[in-house]
Amino acid sequence: MELMAKPTFSIEVSQYGTTDLPATEKASSSSSSFETTNEEGVEESGLSRIWSGQTADYSSDSSSIGTPGDSEEDEEESENENDDVSSKELGLRGLASMSSLEDSLPSKRGLSNHYKGKSKSFGNLGEIGSVKEVAKQENPLNKRRRLQICNKLARKSFYSWQNPKSMPLLPVNEDEDDDDEDDDEEDLKSGFDENKSSSDEEGVKKVVVRKGSFKNRAYKSRSCFALSDLIEEEDDDDDQ
């Protein structure tokens, strides 16, 4: 009988077959063996599996990519809200006392009273188109009342006003003037009577009349004239 020698690779296979191979090597060996048996069918199935896995991975990645973005936006919004809240708290802590101080300032109170009801308040100056928009329209009733008050005050001040530069008016003593005029008339009458009675005493009475006229003229101002002065001057002219 003839003995057939066994190939050497069979022994190696038996030796390596006893050892446990890792899962990755088993998968690679199985895939390679599967590809050798049926090249066309195996390659198509393997590619289909690979592409399906990749698409699954990509789909999972895409789904996972959308969620982290949303979470990041939510986190940013929450951080902004927290920052706003913290800034408001800090502002309230720091400026709560300042608001009362600003209200108590006399300058601010004076300005608020001065511009109260006269101008509009704009939060943004860019909203103002022209200067006319700043002025606030006045109520016609208030305007009429204000004008009436101004007219009353103007009338009172006009009648009660005195010019300090002008000299005060001196009172005129009318009684003294009347007495002087009476004396002049008596002197004239006595002079006429004496002229009729005697011619010697005529010159003396004329001198008395002239002295009286000069006396009255000394007391009276040059700017004031009376009818008695004209009569005296006419009499003097007639006598001369």
From Swiss-Prot:
Its domain of life?
Eukaryota
Note the subunit structure: Interacts with HDA19; Ser-213 is critical for this interaction.
Biased-composition ranges, Acidic residues, are: 70-84, 173-187
One GO biological-process annotation of the entry reads:
positive regulation of DNA-templated transcription
Q: Where is the signal peptide?
A: none
Q: From the Swiss-Prot or TrEMBL record, give the protein name.
A: Protein OXIDATIVE STRESS 3 LIKE 4
Any one of the GO CC terms: nucleus
So what does this one do? Transcription activator which may regulates gene expression through interaction with the histone deacetylase HDA19. Promotes slightly the tolerance to cadmium (Cd) and to oxidizing chemicals (e.g. diamide and tert-butyl hydroperoxide (t-BOOH)).
Q: Does the keyword Ribonucleoprotein apply?
A: no
Q: Where is the stretch described as Kinase-inducible domain (KID)?
A: 202-229
About its domains, the entry says: The kinase-inducible domain (KID, 202-229) is required for interaction with HDA19.
Write out the ranges of the annotated region (Disordered). 1-128, 163-207
The record places the motif (Nuclear localization signal) at: 142-150
Q: Which InterPro entries match?
A: OxStress_Response_Reg (IPR051992)
Q: Where is the composition biased (Basic and acidic residues)?
A: 188-205
- Where found in the cell? Nucleus
Keyword set, alphabetical order: Activator, Nucleus, Phosphoprotein, Stress response, Transcription, Transcription regulation
